[in-house]
Amino acid sequence: FDGRHARAEAAAKGSFVLHAPKGEVHIAPMPMRSQTGSVMFDALFALAQQEMDQDRVDAIRDPAFDEGRPVPCECFQTGARWPYVWTRDVSFAADLALARLDPKRTRQSLQFKLSAARDGHTPGLFVAQDTGSGGSWPISSDRVVWFLAARHLLEDRAFADQVWQALQGTLAQDRAMVFDAQVGLYRGETSFLDWREQTYPDWTREDVRFIGDSYALSTNVLHYQALRLAERLAGQHGDARAADYKAWADALAKQIDARFWREDIGQYMSYIGEAAHPVPYAKVDLLGLSLGILAEVLPPERARRALAAYPMGPAGSPVVWPQEAQQPIYHNRAIWPFVSAYSLRAARQLDDAPRIAAEIRSLMQGA
């Protein structure tokens, strides 16, 4: 790709050697193995597991917490430059793979993001919101992504009880403070796309009120998923609120489809304006679309049309479109592999063979 070449060869006992432009990488045998027609694919699957070890830590730290002192936690840290546990990062990673590859450490990482109320007497557990534009909650309100990960780990009874407690507290809090009954959607920033002018109008760099009062496709889909989980768990607990959660989810699904869809361009918009002007802005994002498809909240024909028309280049699919020439590269003008992975899942659900092939190729090239 782009004038660069790499090849992989199988070695002894399930190991591999990757010959890449920057040198050789020796990949040890891993607990999970794939056996496909591509040695490169199998090697990269092993490499992903080998690199996962670099994120396994016994303590985490962040300069914003306890003066940067280590906090004991057998967790997955976010990365070399982010040696902490962040709600959306660990949740998306867990939903995609970590919950299956290392359920215990994933569960411990998720538990680190649960908190009691700071006032010391309000009952319940709540999911911590990551920082974002304007600080944190409620400008950013995608903390419910935590439940996207937690749903895979409910076989642990103690953890399942925590999930149920956190669902009740977090959903009640968001219903009171973030949900807009007039519009029928939850307010707040796009999930993951949390750098103001990178994806929102340039003037939001100095004024985040618009972001906090707007409505994002991705974040509303995550709220929908959390409500469906609450409906299921409430039913299992014999809790009459199961009917409320179902009604809220059903109504939210209708509003997501009705308000974010633009028939003239055949796409679901990334976000729409505040209640006074709830119009879709001319911006689409691949994560929001993919999450909507996977949640089955978007009608199949519209979903197929939108995914098939989403822009793609030789390197893969950008996370947002259109891109802004005057803005630096980060979310803007960029491909993020985890978003490509969700696009791949969405394509598989819709049997979109060209998109499946393209996203696999993009992920392999990036790796």
Descriptions of predicted regions:
Residues P83-T190, A216-Y224, A334-I356, I360-R361:
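Aromatic-rich carbohydrate-recognition surfaces in CAZymes
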Residues L154, E231, G235-G238, V297, ...:
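Short coil/turn linking the two alpha-helices of tandem helical-hairpin repeats
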Residues F1-P83, R157-F159, W164, Q168-A176, ...:
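Acidic/polar, glycine-enriched structural segments that form the non-catalytic walls/loops
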